[in-house]
Amino acid sequence: MHVFNFAALFTVLATFTATAAAADQGSNTFDQRYQGYPWRPANGPIREEKQENVGHRRGGAEYFTSGSPSIAAEDYSAKNAPSRFEQWKAQQKERAERKQDRGLNGIRRVENYYP
């Protein structure tokens, strides 16, 4: 019985491998038929966005303001809009301040709520 099972399994495997190998022939022409090159980003390498190549989003600040550009858009010309690094630093500072507000065990200090 074991021998029969092994023989059946082997036949199935051999058939499958032969089919796959036959179907795989010429698959290297795929790149020539379609586009000829693998995926690449549309605008070349990812770089920090400058004011010139973005529209109303003002310098890619939406990555840090969770979808709303209003923080960077306060000054409409966006000349002084914070860079991503500055925004990150401000976030860190906020986080540190919030951490200071927490007392033992992560419970917020009572003084913050009842001055």
From Swiss-Prot:
Major site of localization recorded for this protein: secreted
Q: Name one cellular component (GO) term.
A: host cell cytoplasm
Q: What happens when the gene is disrupted?
A: Leads to a slight decrease in lesion numbers and lesion sizes after host leaves infection.
Q: Where is the composition biased (Basic and acidic residues)?
A: 46-55, 91-115
Entry superkingdom: Eukaryota
- Has the keyword Signal been applied to this entry? yes
Keywords, in A-Z order: Host cytoplasm, Secreted, Signal
- Give positions of region: Disordered: 24-115
What is expression of this protein induced or repressed by? Expression is highly up-regulated in invasive hyphae.
Where does this polypeptide localize?
A: Secreted; Host cytoplasm
Q: Which residues form the signal peptide?
A: 1-22
Q: Sum up the protein's function in the record's words.
A: Secreted effector involved in biotrophic colonization of plant cells. Induces an early, basal defense response in susceptible rice, including rapid callose deposition and ROS production in leaves and calli. Also promotes sporulation and mycelia growth suggesting a role across the whole process of interaction, from the biotrophic phase to sporulation.
The entry's protein name is: Biotrophy-associated secreted protein 1
Q: Which organism is it from?
A: Pyricularia oryzae (strain 70-15 / ATCC MYA-4617 / FGSC 8958)
